[in-house]
Amino acid sequence: MGNKWSKSWPQVRERMRRAPAPAADGVGAVSQDLAKHGAITSSNTAATNADCAWLEAQTEEEVGFPVKPQIPLRPMTYKGAVDLSFFLKEKGGLDGLIYSKKRQEILDLWVHNTQGYFPDWQNYTPGPGIRYPLTFGWCYKLVPVDPSEVEEANEGENNCLLHPICQHGIEDEEREVLQWKFDSSLARRHIARELHPEFYKDC
């Protein structure tokens, strides 16, 4: 019996390896289309989807990165989110960085152009307080920074008014200054789904 199984196992293993990974829980509608259909469907256009409109604007304005996407468009997967999280942790730069919408857009555009992931995966739970990633596997949460720390960081400086830390949460609905914090437990536990199961009804 074992002999019969061992003969067919290499073909099965190869088929499993070639099967596309499913989209991670919590990704947007376009990534769900990419996972199900292998392409963006007509239900997600620049007119109906904010992420498509944003990406189209980046392409038309040629703002950001000079390279075009280097690999085919694909949805963010659990493994992709975990790998990207640990890559950014190892290389440094994101952990502890003050969050702003512009910085998120720069990261999304870089990931889109270098890895091919459609930029609808970096979404967070609503505030106030810690914002957990909706995409399972993304190990960066947004943590509020104490206003006194903001003042200490800016002490003696008068030329950084546009720096995100100086905006005192002006972009945030809760008026909180947020920073990205790496949390490896987010690779094992989907806290956003536990706190907000209503966000995952259509997944």
Swiss-Prot record:
Residues 66-75 are annotated as: SH3-binding. A lipid is attached at residue 2 (N-myristoyl glycine). The N-terminal domain is composed of the N-myristoyl glycine and of a cluster of positively charged amino acids. It is required for inner plasma membrane targeting of Nef and virion incorporation, and thereby for infectivity. This domain is also involved in binding to TP53. The SH3-binding domain constituted of PxxP motifs mediates binding to several Src family proteins thereby regulating their tyrosine kinase activity. The same motifs also mediates the association with MAPK3, PI3-kinase and TCR-zeta. HIV-1 lineages are divided in three main groups, M (for Major), O (for Outlier), and N (for New, or Non-M, Non-O). The vast majority of strains found worldwide belong to the group M. Group O seems to be endemic to and largely confined to Cameroon and neighboring countries in West Central Africa, where these viruses represent a small minority of HIV-1 strains. The group N is represented by a limited number of isolates from Cameroonian persons. The group M is further subdivided in 9 clades or subtypes (A to D, F to H, J and K). Factor of infectivity and pathogenicity, required for optimal virus replication. Alters numerous pathways of T-lymphocyte function and down-regulates immunity surface molecules in order to evade host defense and increase viral infectivity. Alters the functionality of other immunity cells, like dendritic cells, monocytes/macrophages and NK cells. In infected CD4(+) T-lymphocytes, down-regulates the surface MHC-I, mature MHC-II, CD4, CD28, CCR5 and CXCR4 molecules. Mediates internalization and degradation of host CD4 through the interaction of with the cytoplasmic tail of CD4, the recruitment of AP-2 (clathrin adapter protein complex 2), internalization through clathrin coated pits, and subsequent transport to endosomes and lysosomes for degradation. Diverts host MHC-I molecules to the trans-Golgi network-associated endosomal compartments by an endocytic pathway to finally target them for degradation. Belongs to the lentivirus primate group Nef protein family. This is Protein Nef. It comes from Human immunodeficiency virus type 1 group M subtype J (isolate SE9280). The lineage of its organism: Viruses, Riboviria, Pararnavirae, Artverviricota, Revtraviricetes. The gene is nef.
